[in-house]
Protein backbone atom coordinates (compact mmCIF):
# COMPACT_ATOMS: atom_id res chain seq x y z
CA UNK A 1 0.00 0.00 0.00
CA UNK A 2 1.05 3.64 0.29
CA UNK A 3 0.93 6.46 2.79
CA UNK A 4 -1.20 9.55 2.27
CA UNK A 5 1.72 10.92 0.23
CA UNK A 6 1.85 7.73 -1.88
CA UNK A 7 5.15 6.56 -0.40
CA UNK A 8 5.51 2.75 -0.35
CA UNK A 9 4.23 1.15 2.85
CA UNK A 10 2.72 -2.05 4.19
CA UNK A 11 -0.24 -2.86 6.40
CA UNK A 12 -2.54 -5.80 7.16
CA UNK A 13 -6.16 -6.66 6.62
CA UNK A 14 -8.03 -9.38 8.50
CA UNK A 15 -10.60 -11.44 6.61
CA UNK A 16 -13.61 -13.07 8.26
CA UNK A 17 -15.28 -15.88 6.31
CA UNK A 18 -18.63 -17.16 7.59
CA UNK A 19 -19.54 -20.82 7.24
CA UNK A 20 -22.35 -19.93 4.85
CA UNK A 21 -20.15 -17.58 2.83
CA UNK A 22 -21.43 -16.01 -0.36
CA UNK A 23 -18.26 -16.14 -2.42
CA UNK A 24 -19.29 -13.33 -4.74
CA UNK A 25 -19.65 -10.36 -2.37
CA UNK A 26 -17.37 -8.45 0.03
CA UNK A 27 -18.06 -6.06 2.91
CA UNK A 28 -15.23 -3.67 3.78
CA UNK A 29 -15.82 -2.94 7.48
CA UNK A 30 -13.83 0.00 8.82
CA UNK A 31 -13.99 -0.34 12.58
CA UNK A 32 -13.04 2.65 14.68
CA UNK A 33 -9.70 2.41 16.45
CA UNK A 34 -9.43 6.08 17.45
CA UNK A 35 -5.99 5.59 18.96
CA UNK A 36 -2.29 5.52 18.05
CA UNK A 37 -0.99 2.54 20.05
CA UNK A 38 0.50 -0.39 18.15
CA UNK A 39 -1.62 -2.90 20.09
CA UNK A 40 -4.83 -1.12 19.08
CA UNK A 41 -4.82 -2.37 15.47
CA UNK A 42 -7.75 -4.65 14.78
CA UNK A 43 -5.53 -7.34 13.27
CA UNK A 44 -4.14 -7.76 16.79
CA UNK A 45 -7.14 -7.08 19.03
CA UNK A 46 -9.50 -9.40 17.14
CA UNK A 47 -7.25 -12.45 17.43
CA UNK A 48 -7.98 -15.10 20.02
CA UNK A 49 -5.44 -14.92 22.81
CA UNK A 50 -4.46 -11.30 22.24
CA UNK A 51 -3.19 -9.52 25.34
CA UNK A 52 -5.44 -6.56 24.70
CA UNK A 53 -7.92 -6.07 27.58
CA UNK A 54 -11.62 -6.27 26.77
CA UNK A 55 -12.88 -3.06 25.21
CA UNK A 56 -16.60 -2.45 25.42
CA UNK A 57 -16.63 -0.20 22.36
CA UNK A 58 -15.33 -3.07 20.25
CA UNK A 59 -18.31 -5.08 21.45
CA UNK A 60 -20.59 -2.39 20.02
CA UNK A 61 -19.01 -2.82 16.60
CA UNK A 62 -19.37 -6.58 16.74
CA UNK A 63 -23.17 -6.21 16.63
CA UNK A 64 -23.04 -5.12 12.99
CA UNK A 65 -20.28 -7.58 12.09
CA UNK A 66 -22.37 -10.39 13.55
CA UNK A 67 -25.33 -9.46 11.36
CA UNK A 68 -23.17 -9.13 8.25
CA UNK A 69 -21.54 -12.52 8.83
CA UNK A 70 -24.88 -14.19 9.53
CA UNK A 71 -26.06 -12.85 6.16
CA UNK A 72 -23.18 -14.78 4.57
CA UNK A 73 -20.95 -11.89 3.50
CA UNK A 74 -17.17 -12.16 3.60
CA UNK A 75 -15.74 -9.26 5.61
CA UNK A 76 -12.37 -7.56 5.31
CA UNK A 77 -11.10 -5.44 8.23
CA UNK A 78 -8.09 -3.35 7.22
CA UNK A 79 -5.58 -1.76 9.58
CA UNK A 80 -6.13 1.54 7.80
CA UNK A 81 -4.07 3.71 10.20
CA UNK A 82 -0.87 2.23 8.75
CA UNK A 83 2.56 1.55 10.15
CA UNK A 84 2.79 4.90 11.96
CA UNK A 85 -0.62 4.37 13.62
CA UNK A 86 -1.90 7.64 12.22
CA UNK A 87 -5.37 8.23 13.65
CA UNK A 88 -7.27 11.05 11.95
CA UNK A 89 -5.42 11.04 8.61
CA UNK A 90 -8.25 10.55 6.14
CA UNK A 91 -6.43 10.26 2.79
CA UNK A 92 -4.02 7.69 4.24
CA UNK A 93 -6.93 5.69 5.68
CA UNK A 94 -8.74 5.79 2.34
CA UNK A 95 -5.76 4.51 0.37
CA UNK A 96 -4.97 1.74 2.82
CA UNK A 97 -8.62 0.71 2.94
CA UNK A 98 -8.77 0.51 -0.86
CA UNK A 99 -5.57 -1.52 -0.99
CA UNK A 100 -7.06 -3.82 1.64
CA UNK A 101 -10.02 -4.42 -0.67
CA UNK A 102 -7.70 -5.14 -3.61
CA UNK A 103 -5.62 -7.56 -1.53
CA UNK A 104 -8.74 -9.38 -0.34
CA UNK A 105 -10.16 -9.71 -3.84
CA UNK A 106 -6.79 -11.07 -5.03
CA UNK A 107 -6.53 -13.63 -2.20
CA UNK A 108 -7.18 -16.84 -4.14
CA UNK A 109 -8.29 -18.92 -1.15
CA UNK A 110 -11.45 -16.81 -0.91
CA UNK A 111 -12.55 -17.53 -4.49
CA UNK A 112 -13.66 -13.94 -4.91
CA UNK A 113 -13.31 -12.30 -8.32
CA UNK A 114 -11.63 -9.02 -9.20
CA UNK A 115 -15.05 -7.57 -10.06
CA UNK A 116 -16.92 -8.92 -7.02
CA UNK A 117 -19.19 -6.19 -5.63
CA UNK A 118 -17.96 -4.37 -2.52
CA UNK A 119 -19.83 -2.29 0.07
CA UNK A 120 -17.90 -0.23 2.64
CA UNK A 121 -19.12 0.85 6.07
CA UNK A 122 -17.66 2.73 9.03
CA UNK A 123 -18.74 4.78 12.04
CA UNK A 124 -17.01 7.64 13.86
CA UNK A 125 -13.25 7.12 13.41
CA UNK A 126 -14.20 4.36 10.98
CA UNK A 127 -16.24 6.93 9.05
CA UNK A 128 -13.05 8.91 8.46
CA UNK A 129 -11.79 5.86 6.61
CA UNK A 130 -15.14 5.13 4.95
CA UNK A 131 -15.55 8.71 3.73
CA UNK A 132 -12.06 8.84 2.28
CA UNK A 133 -12.45 5.37 0.77
CA UNK A 134 -15.49 6.75 -1.04
CA UNK A 135 -13.69 9.95 -2.04
CA UNK A 136 -10.56 8.26 -3.40
CA UNK A 137 -12.10 5.13 -4.94
CA UNK A 138 -12.75 6.67 -8.38
CA UNK A 139 -9.08 7.66 -8.74
CA UNK A 140 -7.13 5.25 -6.52
CA UNK A 141 -9.42 2.20 -6.63
CA UNK A 142 -11.13 2.47 -10.00
CA UNK A 143 -10.79 -1.28 -10.58
CA UNK A 144 -12.98 -1.98 -7.54
CA UNK A 145 -16.66 -2.67 -8.19
CA UNK A 146 -17.84 -0.34 -5.42
CA UNK A 147 -21.56 -0.61 -4.78
CA UNK A 148 -21.89 1.85 -1.93
CA UNK A 149 -20.45 3.55 1.13
CA UNK A 150 -22.13 3.87 4.54
CA UNK A 151 -20.77 6.22 7.18
CA UNK A 152 -22.15 7.58 10.43
CA UNK A 153 -21.02 10.17 12.96
CA UNK A 154 -18.58 11.29 10.29
CA UNK A 155 -15.60 13.53 11.20
CA UNK A 156 -15.72 15.24 7.81
CA UNK A 157 -13.53 18.23 8.71
CA UNK A 158 -10.60 17.60 11.05
CA UNK A 159 -10.24 21.26 12.02
CA UNK A 160 -13.86 21.46 13.10
CA UNK A 161 -13.61 18.12 14.86
CA UNK A 162 -10.53 19.13 16.86
CA UNK A 163 -12.20 22.38 17.93
CA UNK A 164 -15.34 20.57 19.09
CA UNK A 165 -13.37 17.95 21.02
CA UNK A 166 -10.85 20.26 22.68
CA UNK A 167 -11.38 20.92 26.39
CA UNK A 168 -14.42 18.62 26.48
CA UNK A 169 -15.19 15.26 28.03
CA UNK A 170 -13.94 13.50 24.89
CA UNK A 171 -10.83 15.65 24.41
CA UNK A 172 -8.69 12.49 24.42
CA UNK A 173 -9.71 12.09 20.78
CA UNK A 174 -8.04 15.45 20.12
CA UNK A 175 -4.87 14.21 21.84
CA UNK A 176 -4.88 11.06 19.69
CA UNK A 177 -5.77 13.01 16.55
CA UNK A 178 -3.02 15.60 16.86
CA UNK A 179 -0.55 12.80 17.62
CA UNK A 180 -1.67 10.69 14.67
CA UNK A 181 -1.61 13.57 12.20
CA UNK A 182 1.86 14.63 13.36
CA UNK A 183 3.29 11.13 12.98
CA UNK A 184 1.89 10.89 9.47
CA UNK A 185 3.58 14.13 8.41
CA UNK A 186 7.33 14.27 9.01
CA UNK A 187 7.58 18.05 8.58
CA UNK A 188 4.78 18.64 11.06
CA UNK A 189 6.31 16.24 13.57
CA UNK A 190 9.68 18.01 13.31
CA UNK A 191 7.95 21.37 13.80
CA UNK A 192 5.73 20.22 16.68
CA UNK A 193 8.17 18.18 18.78
CA UNK A 194 10.34 21.05 20.11
CA UNK A 195 7.21 23.08 20.85
CA UNK A 196 5.61 20.47 23.11
CA UNK A 197 5.50 21.28 26.80
CA UNK A 198 6.40 18.59 29.32
CA UNK A 199 2.70 17.80 29.62
CA UNK A 200 2.39 17.71 25.84
CA UNK A 201 5.30 15.27 25.51
CA UNK A 202 3.75 12.97 28.12
CA UNK A 203 0.43 13.12 26.28
CA UNK A 204 1.99 12.20 22.93
CA UNK A 205 3.96 9.36 24.51
CA UNK A 206 0.81 8.09 26.22
CA UNK A 207 -1.23 8.29 23.02
CA UNK A 208 1.46 6.36 21.13
CA UNK A 209 1.35 3.47 23.60
CA UNK A 210 -2.31 3.21 24.65
CA UNK A 211 -5.70 2.55 23.10
CA UNK A 212 -9.08 4.24 23.07
CA UNK A 213 -10.48 3.64 26.55
CA UNK A 214 -7.20 4.26 28.38
CA UNK A 215 -6.69 7.55 26.55
CA UNK A 216 -10.29 8.62 27.18
CA UNK A 217 -9.85 8.07 30.90
CA UNK A 218 -6.46 9.82 30.96
CA UNK A 219 -7.27 13.02 29.08
CA UNK A 220 -10.83 14.27 29.61
CA UNK A 221 -11.28 18.05 29.66
CA UNK A 222 -7.78 18.61 28.25
CA UNK A 223 -6.93 21.77 26.32
CA UNK A 224 -4.73 20.49 23.51
CA UNK A 225 -4.99 23.65 21.41
CA UNK A 226 -3.41 25.74 24.16
CA UNK A 227 -0.18 26.68 25.91
CA UNK A 228 -0.87 23.79 28.26
CA UNK A 229 0.27 21.20 25.71
CA UNK A 230 2.07 23.22 23.03
CA UNK A 231 4.07 26.44 23.28
CA UNK A 232 2.14 28.84 21.10
CA UNK A 233 -0.64 26.25 21.01
CA UNK A 234 -3.44 28.80 21.28
CA UNK A 235 -2.80 29.58 17.61
CA UNK A 236 -2.00 25.99 16.57
CA UNK A 237 -4.81 25.76 14.03
CA UNK A 238 -3.71 29.06 12.45
CA UNK A 239 -0.10 28.01 11.82
CA UNK A 240 0.58 27.66 8.06
CA UNK A 241 2.23 24.25 8.44
CA UNK A 242 -0.92 23.01 10.19
CA UNK A 243 -3.51 24.67 7.97
CA UNK A 244 -1.76 23.42 4.80
CA UNK A 245 -2.18 19.86 6.05
CA UNK A 246 -5.67 20.09 7.52
CA UNK A 247 -7.14 21.72 4.40
CA UNK A 248 -6.55 18.38 2.66
CA UNK A 249 -8.51 16.54 5.36
CA UNK A 250 -11.91 18.01 4.44
CA UNK A 251 -14.42 15.69 2.77
CA UNK A 252 -16.21 17.23 -0.19
CA UNK A 253 -13.75 20.10 -0.64
CA UNK A 254 -12.33 18.88 -3.96
CA UNK A 255 -14.48 17.92 -6.93
CA UNK A 256 -11.83 15.37 -7.94
CA UNK A 257 -12.58 13.50 -4.69
CA UNK A 258 -16.25 12.78 -5.33
CA UNK A 259 -17.76 9.32 -4.76
CA UNK A 260 -19.36 7.67 -7.78
CA UNK A 261 -21.20 4.92 -5.86
CA UNK A 262 -24.19 5.67 -3.57
CA UNK A 263 -23.37 7.23 -0.19
CA UNK A 264 -25.48 6.74 2.95
CA UNK A 265 -24.64 9.12 5.80
CA UNK A 266 -26.34 9.20 9.20
CA UNK A 267 -25.68 11.52 12.12
CA UNK A 268 -27.36 12.42 15.40
CA UNK A 269 -28.54 16.02 15.48
CA UNK A 270 -27.32 16.23 19.08
CA UNK A 271 -24.02 14.40 18.59
CA UNK A 272 -21.80 15.58 21.43
CA UNK A 273 -18.55 14.28 19.93
CA UNK A 274 -18.47 14.90 16.17
CA UNK A 275 -19.76 18.11 14.51
CA UNK A 276 -23.10 17.44 12.81
CA UNK A 277 -22.98 20.38 10.39
CA UNK A 278 -19.53 19.46 9.04
CA UNK A 279 -20.84 16.03 8.05
CA UNK A 280 -23.97 17.56 6.51
CA UNK A 281 -21.86 20.01 4.51
CA UNK A 282 -19.66 17.19 3.21
CA UNK A 283 -22.70 15.30 1.96
CA UNK A 284 -24.08 18.42 0.30
CA UNK A 285 -20.76 19.24 -1.35
CA UNK A 286 -20.38 15.71 -2.68
CA UNK A 287 -23.87 15.93 -4.15
CA UNK A 288 -23.09 19.31 -5.72
CA UNK A 289 -20.12 17.63 -7.39
CA UNK A 290 -22.32 14.85 -8.78
CA UNK A 291 -22.57 12.20 -6.05
CA UNK A 292 -25.77 10.49 -4.93
CA UNK A 293 -26.06 11.03 -1.17
CA UNK A 294 -28.76 10.05 1.30
CA UNK A 295 -28.19 12.01 4.52
CA UNK A 296 -30.19 10.86 7.53
CA UNK A 297 -30.53 13.14 10.54
CA UNK A 298 -31.53 11.33 13.72
CA UNK A 299 -33.60 13.83 15.66
CA UNK A 300 -34.48 11.99 18.89
CA UNK A 301 -33.06 14.30 21.59
CA UNK A 302 -31.63 11.48 23.73
CA UNK A 303 -29.46 10.05 20.94
CA UNK A 304 -25.78 10.73 21.55
CA UNK A 305 -22.77 9.68 19.50
CA UNK A 306 -22.64 6.08 20.79
CA UNK A 307 -26.39 5.50 20.76
CA UNK A 308 -26.68 6.77 17.18
CA UNK A 309 -24.25 4.07 16.06
CA UNK A 310 -26.21 1.29 17.71
CA UNK A 311 -29.74 2.25 16.73
CA UNK A 312 -28.67 2.46 13.08
CA UNK A 313 -27.21 -1.06 12.87
CA UNK A 314 -30.38 -2.31 11.07
CA UNK A 315 -30.28 0.59 8.58
CA UNK A 316 -26.64 -0.09 7.73
CA UNK A 317 -27.48 -3.76 7.23
CA UNK A 318 -30.37 -2.78 4.93
CA UNK A 319 -28.07 -0.48 2.95
CA UNK A 320 -25.56 -3.32 2.46
CA UNK A 321 -28.31 -5.71 1.35
CA UNK A 322 -29.86 -3.17 -1.02
CA UNK A 323 -26.55 -2.20 -2.64
CA UNK A 324 -25.72 -5.83 -3.37
CA UNK A 325 -29.24 -6.27 -4.78
CA UNK A 326 -28.80 -3.20 -7.02
CA UNK A 327 -31.97 -1.60 -5.66
CA UNK A 328 -32.78 1.98 -6.59
CA UNK A 329 -31.12 4.80 -4.65
CA UNK A 330 -32.05 8.51 -4.48
CA UNK A 331 -30.35 10.72 -7.04
CA UNK A 332 -28.46 13.83 -5.99
CA UNK A 333 -28.85 14.93 -2.36
CA UNK A 334 -31.70 13.64 -0.24
CA UNK A 335 -32.13 14.65 3.40
CA UNK A 336 -34.29 12.53 5.69
CA UNK A 337 -35.19 13.18 9.32
CA UNK A 338 -35.82 10.16 11.54
CA UNK A 339 -36.79 10.16 15.20
CA UNK A 340 -36.09 6.52 16.13
CA UNK A 341 -34.32 4.38 13.50
CA UNK A 342 -35.37 1.19 15.32
CA UNK A 343 -39.05 2.01 14.91
CA UNK A 344 -39.52 1.10 11.26
CA UNK A 345 -41.71 -1.27 9.30
CA UNK A 346 -38.69 -2.87 7.65
CA UNK A 347 -37.16 -3.81 11.00
CA UNK A 348 -40.42 -5.57 11.87
CA UNK A 349 -40.78 -7.16 8.44
CA UNK A 350 -37.31 -8.70 8.54
CA UNK A 351 -37.87 -10.14 12.03
CA UNK A 352 -34.98 -8.27 13.61
CA UNK A 353 -36.60 -8.02 17.04
CA UNK A 354 -33.80 -10.03 18.66
CA UNK A 355 -31.26 -7.53 17.31
CA UNK A 356 -33.43 -4.63 18.46
CA UNK A 357 -33.63 -6.16 21.94
CA UNK A 358 -29.83 -6.49 22.03
CA UNK A 359 -29.41 -2.86 21.03
CA UNK A 360 -31.95 -1.60 23.55
CA UNK A 361 -30.33 -3.64 26.33
CA UNK A 362 -26.90 -2.20 25.54
CA UNK A 363 -28.26 1.32 25.36
CA UNK A 364 -30.11 0.92 28.63
CA UNK A 365 -27.42 -0.91 30.59
CA UNK A 366 -24.15 0.48 29.22
CA UNK A 367 -24.75 3.75 27.39
CA UNK A 368 -27.87 5.40 28.75
CA UNK A 369 -29.94 8.25 27.30
CA UNK A 370 -27.74 10.83 25.56
CA UNK A 371 -24.74 8.56 26.26
CA UNK A 372 -25.15 9.40 29.95
CA UNK A 373 -23.71 6.15 31.33
CA UNK A 374 -20.57 6.47 29.20
CA UNK A 375 -20.09 10.08 30.21
CA UNK A 376 -20.51 9.27 33.89
CA UNK A 377 -18.06 6.37 33.59
CA UNK A 378 -15.38 8.63 32.11
CA UNK A 379 -15.91 11.23 34.82
CA UNK A 380 -15.82 8.61 37.59
CA UNK A 381 -12.72 6.80 36.36
CA UNK A 382 -10.71 9.67 34.88
CA UNK A 383 -7.02 9.56 35.67
CA UNK A 384 -5.73 13.05 34.96
CA UNK A 385 -2.17 13.48 33.69
From Swiss-Prot:
The keyword Glycoprotein applies. Belongs to the AB hydrolase superfamily. Lipase family. Class Lip subfamily. The keyword Glycoprotein applies. Its EC number is 3.1.1.-, 3.1.1.3. InterPro entries: AB_hydrolase_fold, Lipase_secreted. Induction: Constitutively expressed regardless of pH conditions or exposure time. It is an enzyme of class 3 (hydrolase). PANTHER family: LIPASE 5, PTHR34853. This is Secreted triacylglycerol lipase LIP6. One of its GO terms (cellular component) is extracellular region. The gene is LIP6. GO terms for molecular function: triacylglycerol lipase activity. Its main location: secreted. It is found in: Secreted. Glycans are attached at residue 157. It comes from the Eukaryota. The active site is at residues 124, 271, 305. Keywords: Disulfide bond, Glycoprotein, Hydrolase, Lipid degradation, Lipid metabolism, Secreted, Virulence. Coiled coil: none annotated. It catalyses: a triacylglycerol + H2O = a diacylglycerol + a fatty acid + H(+); a monoacylglycerol + H2O = glycerol + a fatty acid + H(+); a diacylglycerol + H2O = a monoacylglycerol + a fatty acid + H(+).
Amino acid sequence: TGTHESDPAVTATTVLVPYNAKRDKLVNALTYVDADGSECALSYTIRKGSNFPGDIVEDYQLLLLQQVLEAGYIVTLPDYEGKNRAFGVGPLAGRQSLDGIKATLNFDRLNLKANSPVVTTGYSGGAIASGWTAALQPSYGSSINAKGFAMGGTPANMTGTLLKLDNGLFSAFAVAGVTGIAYANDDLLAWLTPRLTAKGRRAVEFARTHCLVSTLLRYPFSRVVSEDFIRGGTHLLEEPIVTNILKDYVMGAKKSQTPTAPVYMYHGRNDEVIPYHDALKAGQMWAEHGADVLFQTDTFPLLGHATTELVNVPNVLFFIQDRFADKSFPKGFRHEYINNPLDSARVREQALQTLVDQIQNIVGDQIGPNDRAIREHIRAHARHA
